[in-house]
Amino acid sequence: MTAVKTVRVAAAQFAAGEDVAKNWAACLRMIDRAAEGKADLVVLPEFSNHASWYQDQKHCYEVAVDLDGDFLAAIGERARRHHLHIVVNCTVRRGNDVVTATSILFDDQGQRLAASDKQVLIGHENDFLRKAETTCPIVETKLGRLGLYACMDGVICETPRGLALSGADILCNSLNSFALDEASLHVPVRAAENHVFVVAANKCGPLIPEALLEPVSAATSIPVKFLNGAGESQIVAPDGRVLVMAPRERENVVFADIDPRQARDKRRPDGTDRFAVRRPELYAPIGEDPGARPIAEQRAAATLEVAVVTPRSTGAAAVEEIANLVAKVTAEGAELVVLPELFCFEGGVVTNPIDGLGRSQLAIDALAAACQRGARVVASLVTHDGGNHRLSGVVIGAEGLEWAQPMLHRSQRHAWVTPGDALRTHDLPWGRLAVLPGADAIQPEAARLAAIAGAEVLAVPFAPLEAWELATGLVERSAENRLCLVAATEPGRLGASLVTTLEEDFTVMTPWKSRPFDGLLSFPIVKRAPSETSSIFRATVHPARAHNKVVSRRTDLVAGRPWHLAAAITKRASHA
């Protein structure tokens, strides 16, 4: 089925409490508002039938809806009446007291086209709901190819990634979230990294029974305002631009006119097809049972002093300058220094890899001589093995080259490169390091592999091509994997280097000692370098904090990934 050229999509934002009948009426009212705005598709929030708060399993089952019951029949009737596609998320009875959190799609004739169960549950949802046992196919409609997911599914990468790889043009995300970083990070990054549209509908108003707001706030030290839906429902373009956003605190419907076909061209500015260069054969660990592949126990330092060093000179002249700067910062205590991609090549471009090997070796020798006090330098340089030229993230110490991680994904910008065959890690006195050279960091699977392998720190010597890489992409690599990250690039129109570290207090609904709860779910501490030319940028990161990946009870950001539903990620998929 061919998508129409322009589609008006809408996200409806409203509150849903304990009264199923009132929530039902609210759904119908907001659908009517979307229809008044001439929407072709409207997405409603998660748990539109009842607040996600239950006395026990019996209560959870009682307030859930039947797929063929009156609640959803009325939604379908509204779809037919308004000639409108609708996505609504409800708790659904599955028999024998089993309940799922399910997104249901109706077409403009009122027919139910899909029912997609939530893959990643958070906190107490695990006590009452069954997570998805199968994936929901992409749905071909006259509007385009639609994929459905819900809230926590999008806080980590696997569910949206699988939908995009299966061909979705538009991802419909129903949320029930207090988290301020949904709108600022987790929603827009899924559009950009997959080059698809995202229509995300969140709630406003209390997420728990109003009578319990003050008692729960007192018991958990979570301010009452963060027990409400964070709103900011939004529609995001494939380049990560937020086209429209609702306010935080009131009912609203937001609209945008989009061309779903724009999501089908996956080429980056240099001509690289971001999906075609994927390496599913390398991603197998993502689809393996975490219980059968536990992260090895290890010790990591509480703190690590890091620095990004960028040259003012270009080409071969940058080697001496950078060596002097490395000597300075390592003598002053920097333990890990990361340099921009191909820092000693004009414009970050290698025109002749054979000559590039020679210049890279000169750089390695100079940097080794500059390393002080046991420090290491990560640089992006030309390496050679088995007849292959590589673009590698190299780790250099006082004794010279210690280790190299070849770039894993082909890039038109570095057409001379033969990609490597695995993501590996390097153990250092302060912890475990992974390096993503070239454009590897735009692929969420690469950082995921690093986290599964037990890395605490991720070094990224790179050159961005798209604004989202610095705005949300690298931040999400840190957030969804609970990794410290040091990203080095030449300052330019898209931004400059950044460093992320992790909060000590992290797990929601546990006692926090070092800071008050701020409404962020997994957003790391981000320090950005000045956008103007700055030779040295210093920061402190906390490797040991990467060991806690439990964002809420029974919800581990890495071990809790939907590994059993990852076939679209680990097998070559069509996205034509």
Summary of predicted features, one role per range:
Residues 20, 25-115, 177-196, 213, ...:
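Cys-nucleophile CN-hydrolase/nitrilase-fold catalytic domain and related Cys-dependent amidase chemistry
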Residues 65-67, 93-170, 175-185, 189, ...:
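Active-site catalytic loop in hydrolytic enzyme cores
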Residues 2-17, 296-316:
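Short beta-strand segments enriched in small/hydrophobic residues
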Residues 137-140, 203-303, 425, 491-576:
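C-terminal beta-strand edge segments of enzyme domains
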Residues 89, 174, 201-202, 380, ...:
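Generic beta-sheet signal
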Residues 8, 87, 102, 135, ...:
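Conserved beta-strand and immediately adjacent loop positions that scaffold enzyme active sites
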Residues 10, 87, 147, 199, ...:
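Structural detector of well-ordered beta-strand residues that form the stable sheet scaffold
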